[in-house]
Amino acid sequence: MKLNKRFFYGVLTAVALLAAGCSKDNTDPVPDPGTGEQLVENPKVRAAVRTMMSEAARTESTLNGVAVWQEEYASSGEWPKGSDNDTRRQMWSVTKTFTSMAVGIAVGEGKLSLSEKVAPMFPEEVAEAEKNMTDAQKANLEALTVRHLLIMANGHKKDPTVEYATEYFKKDPFGSLKYIHNEWVDVSGLLTKHDSTLPELFFGYPFDAAPGEKFCYDSFSSCMLSEIITKKTGETMADYLYKRMFKPMGLDRPEWEDIHGVTAGGWGLHLSTDEMLAFGRLLLDGGKWDGQQIIPEDYLKEAVKDQIKDRMNNGQNYSTTGYGYQIRTRSDGSLYMAVGLFGQYIVVIPDKKAVIVMTSAMPFDADNILKDLSKVMALLNGDLDSSVKPLELAWKYIVPEL
């Protein structure tokens, strides 16, 4: 984890590397990054993590990082394929949960209300968009609140992110290839390449449903929350959240993409597994870090509850029943998770007082992109996602040992 307390993490890294090269578990205590307590790894979890990563390697899984923290123990982790606990990777939609916490902090500071209407914040963009709307669509837009954006019920019936990205890619496929890199896809760069701002694109998409009635996963909702944070605070969301969350936790400034100078709220955050663990612990502890209340507790309690129904992985041990404030939730409160494309996860299991984080690579070869062009198009159409496999492995090996 990129912390200012470099000594702690130098020790942790050394221990992790030593453990990875040994045939038995390391029992030497290490300082906990959140409390400074001297802790040792849970040997059962340590063994489970190794076994999980061994199976991932055998099955050619794209999993490239897993780390586990449980109260009273030091964290355990494995980072194959040339990466380690300090390697930052694209979080994809895990970013959305961080966006939600920025909203929560702004609410706590009195700068924003969840019941506040969105349209009056963007008068020029809304006036232009309404020229092409029916009366019903105008009414839907004018009813839209900040809370509707948080729970993915903004009145769109489809996710415009996929549609716009596909449209731009098809217009200039070879020019768009430069935005596809080995470890990540620069969606923000692809959108910035075009003149339209994100609010213009968002308001220009049909509002055919009444806000709050229908769940529709929509990354532009998250990006609009970032736009709102900037309007209400005068800062980019990346700067705002760094000062109020990352820095107080001892974390370095995050790598975060922007669209026309505005922090990408729906994707674009790059984190290491240690940074992901720290965030998961922050959520688990009710928004506190080392005794300091960073996220308002009342906001966080609502954020991790089912606010709208939307089942994911139905019938599995890791299933979720709904969506909170930019996070997948379970109605009984036993599980909530930030989920990103291709297998990025921050999983919080309150009754186990544990956090599991996982990162995964993209399932296509960016160095020979023409060979895998069909996979790229499947990605843009929302049809390519290998994210279930890491959860299966985690519930097979890690969760039983917690």
Feature locations, PLM:
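Structured C-terminal helix/loop/strand segments within mature extracytoplasmic catalytic/sensor domains
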Residues: 335-402
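Active-site-proximal alpha-helical segments within enzyme catalytic domains
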Residues: 221-228, 267-288, 344-361
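Active-site Gly/Thr loop motif
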Residues: 251-253, 301-355
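Bacterial Sec-dependent N-terminal signal peptides
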Residues: 10, 15-43
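A short, well-structured edge-of-sheet supersecondary motif
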Residues: 52-83, 346-347, 353-357
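Active-site SXXK
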Residues: 72, 89-115, 149, 225-229, ...
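Active-site helix/loop module of the DD-peptidase/beta-lactamase fold
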Residues: 109-161, 204-206, 210, 220, ...
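Short, charged, amphipathic alpha-helices and their helix-cap/turn boundaries
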Residues: 73-78, 119-120, 163-210, 235-254
